[in-house]
Amino acid sequence: MRFPLFAALAGSMFATAASAQEVTLRAVTSFAEGTQFSKNFERFIQKVNADGKGVVQINYIGGPRAMPPFEVGNAVRTKVIDIANVTGAFYTNLMPEADALKLIGKPADAQRKDGTFALIEQLHAQKLNAHYLARQFHNVPFHIYMNKKIDKLDFTGLKIRVTPVYKDVVEALGGTTVTTAPGEVYTALERGVVDGYGWPITGIFDLGWEKVTKFRLEPAFYSVEVGVLVNMDVWKSLTDAQKKVLNDAALWLEGLDSENEALIKAERDKQTAAGIAPIDLGPAASKEFLTKANEVGWASVIKRSPENGAKLRQLSGN
């Protein structure tokens, strides 16, 4: 097993009681600890543990060193863990509709008001046995990064590391897709196993990928989605007071997205300083790219889940 720590946890109760009133939930993140897409979750844990003394606490087990990223969704489903920081791209095998989350760029509060969040919650309950507690990073876009410069919108001959987020658009542009865990990307780039990769605008410096990256294709596209999931059996077992601590912290966590605009600007400047050059193919190609990315993204979701995919697209407005 690649995560022996969790083999020991799998047979235990969902949460340990410190007292008659307090429960402790076990948490993992699907991204490396202390990196861009784990940091806010770690702040969330600190807030819960500060505000929830005597009510609810979170025991932070860690990241991919404890559990492979693509196992996290199933670990929530089967109650191996209680709460997780994970992107839907890592559990589309269990919930195909999770691939639509990248196409819904509205703020979380807007999604809560217009019914989008309710449908996403319903789908997680049905297919992942999970409560969808929070969504982060709606205003952080993705890019395709490359080590070979292109002069037209054609990926023929290029091997691009993907998750389900980028797979359809890379293939639509003629590229060959390669799937690896984030921890394997550096070596794949260094050895020429892949010519590029998809990743958000933020976070590559956490992983050292700037050392093996030459170009960033413009424009940015899609929206990052990192959710906080709670096993549904665990969620139902919590008291109203325990749920309130988690719900309040979840809304606070979603509010941290206001920090992202400054982070994105700083990241672009940092990439420029590191020698990562933008590839701008011009307005027509940029429009074609964005249109294709949106259309193939939705087509893939609707093909795998016709009814729910259509509902999600209608709610998304795009």
Residue ranges of model-derived segments:
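Bacterial N-terminal signal peptides
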Residues: 4-13
